[in-house]
Amino acid sequence: MVGHAIHGMIALGGRSRRGSRVTPTPDSTLADAQQTIADLRRELAESEPQKAAMAEVLGVINSSPGELSPVFDAILEKAHTLCGASHGVLATYDGEHFRAVATHELPTPFAELLRRPFPPEPGGPQEQLLRGERLFHAPGASVLTGPGGDTPRTRAAREAGQRAFLMLPLRKDGRLLGYITANRNEPGPLSDKQIALLENFAAQATLFE
């Protein structure tokens, strides 16, 4: 055996090791297949509510030709349901002012305040979106005070019980058309999957601008 390579052993002289190949056992192959099937079933189950929500939005579009208000209402409501958001708005931007065109589960005074045109607050979330930020995510209570101090909108948010805040832009061809928010009454971040869902609905909203 001296002078001959021995498979499965470490070669002398610092050469690389050659080992026997491990052949998957029937049990491991079956377990992998079962895990793959389980993953596919879970993904399918998770996608079904989104498909159903999109179908309902399409139904609203078909039943309200030329009317954008019910379409925006439907997009916002379905997005919040899937993301587990308590309340929020869908707002448009005319180049100078923002204005909510749909609100969901907001106290009436707060909703009316956001429906009035307002400029972006210096350093605020809307201004950050104008600078090109992908999103503004404030999972804690610090969102209740803006960088410029209290404003009528931040006070109304506090009175509405808002404790977590996510704002996503509505963009088309690089131009900011507005934003959509998903807010919660308990502190804590939205997951990447929930943010991705909201981005999908934001993309749908830009089709009607």
Feature locations, PLM:
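Signal-transmission linkers at sensory-effector interfaces
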Residues: 21-70, 81, 193
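Short regulatory alpha-helical segment in sensory/regulatory domains of signaling proteins that mediates
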Residues: 49, 58-66, 75-84, 89-92, ...
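GAF sensory/regulatory domain recognition
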Residues: 76-80, 88-122, 131-135
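Short beta-strand-to-loop transition segments that serve as allosteric relay/switch motifs
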Residues: 106, 179-188
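Regulatory sensory and allosteric helical modules in signal-transduction proteins
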Residues: 109-148, 155-158, 166
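A short, aliphatic-rich beta-strand micro-motif
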Residues: 163-171
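Short hydrophobic/glycine-rich mini-motifs in sensory/regulatory modules
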Residues: 170-180
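Allosteric cytosolic regulatory segments
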Residues: 199-206
